[in-house]
From Swiss-Prot:
Biased composition (Basic and acidic residues): 112-134
UniProt entry keywords in alphabetical sequence: Nucleus, Ribonucleoprotein, Ribosome biogenesis, rRNA processing
Record-given protein name: U3 small nucleolar RNA-associated protein 25
GO BP term (any one): maturation of SSU-rRNA from tricistronic rRNA transcript (SSU-rRNA, 5.8S rRNA, LSU-rRNA)
InterPro entries: P-loop_NTPase, UTP25, UTP25_C, UTP25_NTPase-like
GO CC annotations, alphabetized: nucleolus; small-subunit processome
Length: 734
């Protein structure tokens, strides 16, 4: 199998960019607690038991000992400075007063002492680091869930102006809170049997919808109607004004996406762009926030009801096994900043705890040298492109709390790598994924960016969503919803995936892990083809060659055989020839790293490639070697340059000296096809004169397993004909 796809651009810019932001050593200057007594204290004290004091506990300096008794609580100075007689006297007082003063009073006195040092209306608490990684410390310590902070608000339930009446037509009620158990059982049986019925429809802007429903018998199903603005949605009262301001209206395909999302259907959207990313982000943030607030308010109201009702038989099921309800998977820290900014603008809290720390560790300015880079590149890699992160958000009536421990969080935002590192530890006893047991909305944004990292991490996370927890974590099972207890949470969970293009990996995720009883929708565009968008001052002959492959497992071997027998001989003859028509300046674009290694080794060892001078650039090539290969290729010292798709994804080089392009395989991203073909226009000498222009050409190799790629490059209609054509296997475009 290929080497693991490392963190985003970490293999290229980890030393230059990662060292001063993200998870680098920028935070290493903080003092660390070195005593075992601190760990003991953190074990005893749950983070949420006294959340109002949490910030002050975290700001205790490394030189202060955690209080263990009355003496330390009342006298924060060092014990070594006290006379022995005074210590004995205080010890006697401690014994005499042991029964008269409860333990929590000692803790409160200590915290009150610290509060006198901090008097800020909007406190931004910095968490002290231990010897553990700071994110690990934040997310996994004090796992016992606590509802004490919610209980503090029980008395306020019903007093706020933003209280909502329960609406039986609200999808939150029909899908999450009070679903029809009989109907759920029926649909789950259909799903487990693989009985999906597809409804296909054409949408606005040449989009097509494939809506799969778990109903083979042909019941009364209809595609949710498009919505034009947020007034048509069932929103929390407090979100209505901010939603109207932030999202005045839904335009184009967003109208259909919004109706499906707020109907709790699964959605796979295959046309995410830099131009529509912000509106999609606001839409998904609004939905996630609306869901969290409705869930938490229902719990608080029922807490108040239980505190007043003396009936012991009352049953209120309003919770999952653990608190986190929304999981948002993102490619980079900067993407996390954008998502959280969208959430905070919609929520408009009075306080944001740890906001400063969050911005220091996650936010960064764009690289000024990237102004010439494409929009999609700057959208993905702009700012802090570190892909190792995880953070929890907790919501109260007036506050957003950053870096809340996962078991006390409402929303978890993480990269696949950041989340897997705490789920899949070497020590099995330390592995933990119970915090994913009650996820009700899973959002994967910019999935095509995650594909270039390591898609296996995404699959691993989805395999561990909504599993029965191994421990109780303070769960009140009398409040757990029935469909959780019946192990049907995966069929209730809503999954939303946005991507710039569809791949087999994402299609597999759609088939295997998107199992929603409310149905699942795939929204894809009609493609005109990247070949129509190539900007060259001259026309270039483009030839597409199809080779037959019966089995997917044999496809790499058959592709290599086709390349070495049908393409390489002509290339070997041309590079040794003279004149303008020789094969010098041939760039071979290879999507797969495994195929790249195979072709590189062939050029190095095969007698058939002895006379071909070549260079190679992959995602793992050192910067100096990259520069040398590009320079020698441009000057003609190298006749052939091997170039991988992931190298282009992370670098977006403009390679000069290209006269011939061979696509060993089609790129996943259609933008890459256009950009690589446009290399032919970077050499003015090659364009001079009609004879020189006629020597420029493009050749691409494909099989039936490249259907998605081919559709994006030649267009939806052309691709269908090229895959079905029986009269020939060569197709030329000019």
């Amino acid at each position: 199998m290929p080497p693991p796809r490392k963190r985003g651009r970490g293999s290229f810019r980890g030393s230059s960019r990662g060292a001063h932001r993200g998870r680098g050593h920028a935070r290493g200057g903080r003092n660390s607690f070195q005593t075992s007594r601190v760990d003991e204290k953190r074990e005893i004290e749950s983070s949420d038991d006294e959340e109002q004091f949490n910030g002050f506990e975290d700001e205790v300096s490394g030189g202060e000992e955690p209080m263990q008794d009355v003496e330390i609580a009342s006298e924060p100075s060092s014990e070594d400075e006290e006379p022995a007689t005074e210590r004995s006297y205080n010890s006697l007082l401690q014994l005499l007063n042991a029964k008269s003063e409860p333990s929590h009073a000692r803790k409160r006195r200590k915290l009150d002492h610290l509060e006198s040092k901090q008097d800020k209306p909007n406190r931004e608490v910095e968490i002290q680091e231990t010897t553990k990684e700071p994110e690990e410390q934040d997310v996994l310590e004090n796992q016992e869930a606590s509802e004490e902070e919610d209980n503090v608000e029980v008395d306020r339930a019903g007093e706020s102006d933003d209280e909502d009446e329960e609406d039986a037509s609200d999808p939150f009620e029909t899908h999450i809170s009070s679903p029809d158990e009989t109907e759920i059982s029926k649909r789950v049986k259909e799903i487990t049997a693989g009985k999906w019925r597809s409804i296909k429809s054409s949408l606005l802007e040449t989009f097509r919808l494939i809506y799969n429903i778990p109903d083979e018998e042909g019941g009364s199903w209809s595609i949710p109607s498009a919505v034009k603005n947020t007034r048509s949605l069932k929103l929390k009262k407090r979100l209505i004004p901010t939603a109207a301001e932030r999202i005045p209206s839904f335009s184009g395909i967003s109208q259909n996406i919004a109706s499906l999302v707020f109907n709790y259907s699964d959605v796979l959207f295959g046309d995410r762009k830099a131009s529509n990313a912000a509106q999609l982000r606001d839409l998904l943030s609004l939905h996630a926030l609306n869901h969290v607030l409705k869930t938490r308010d229902r719990v608080i109201k029922n807490n108040a009801r239980l505190s007043r009702d003396i009936n012991p038989d009352i049953e209120l099921r309003d919770q999952g096994f653990t608190r986190p309800k929304v999981l948002i998977i993102l490619p980079t820290r900067q993407a996390c900043v954008r998502f959280i900014d969208s959430i905070s603008r919609l929520y408009q809290p009075e306080q944001q705890e740890n906001r400063k720390r969050f911005m220091d560790e996650y936010n960064a300015k764009d690289n000024e040298s990237w102004e010439s880079k494409p929009d999609d590149f700057r959208d993905l890699f702009g700012g802090n492109d570190d892909d190792m992160f995880r953070i929890g958000l907790k919501f109260t009536r007036k506050t957003i709390k950053y870096y809340s421990q996962f078991y006390n969080s409402d929303i978890i935002l993480a990269s696949p790598l950041g989340l897997r590192t705490i789920m899949d530890k070497e020590d099995e006893k330390k592995r933990d994924h119970d915090f994913l047991s009650s996820i009700e909305i899973a959002i994967v944004d910019h999935a095509d960016g995650l594909l270039m990292q390591n898609w296996e991490h995404v699959e691993y996370i989805f395999e561990h969503l909504n599993l029965q927890p191994k421990e109780a974590h303070g769960c009140d099972f009398s409040r757990v919803r029935t469909w959780y207890l019946d192990d049907r949470a995966r069929y209730i969970r809503q999954t939303i995936v946005t991507t710039s293009f569809l791949t087999p990996e994402m299609n597999s995720l759609f088939s295997q892990h998107m199992q929603n009883v409310a149905g699942k929708a795939k929204i894809l565009p009609q493609y005109n083809g990247a070949i129509t968008e190539v900007a060259l001052p001259i026309t270039v002959k483009q030839t597409f060659s199809r080779f037959d492959s019966t089995f997917a497992l044999k496809e790499p071997d058959l592709r290599f055989k086709y390349f070495t027998t049908a393409i390489l001989p002509a290339l070997a003859r041309s590079v040794t020839g003279k004149g303008e028509g020789n094969g010098a300046g041939t760039l071979i674009f290879i999507p797969s790293y495994l195929d790249f290694v195979r072709v590189r080794n062939f050029f190095s060892t095969s007698s058939r490639a002895t006379n071909i001078s070549f260079g190679a650039i992959s995602e793992y090539t050192e910067q100096s070697e990259m520069s040398r290969s590009r320079s020698h290729f441009m000057s003609g010292r190298l006749s052939v340059l091997l170039y991988t798709e992931r190298a282009h994804h992370f670098r977006r080089y403009n390679i000069r000296g290209v006269k011939h392009v061979i696509f060993y395989g089609l790129p996943e991203n259609p933008i890459f096809f256009r950009e690589v073909v446009q290399y032919l226009g970077l050499d003015p000498g090659a364009l001079a004169g009609s004879a020189g222009a006629e020597t420029l050409d493009v050749r691409a190799v494909f099989s039936k397993y490249d259907a998605f790629k081919l559709e994006r490059i030649v267009g939806t209609q052309r691709a269908a004909n090229m895959l079905k054509e029986k009269g020939g296997d060569t197709f030329r475009f000019v």
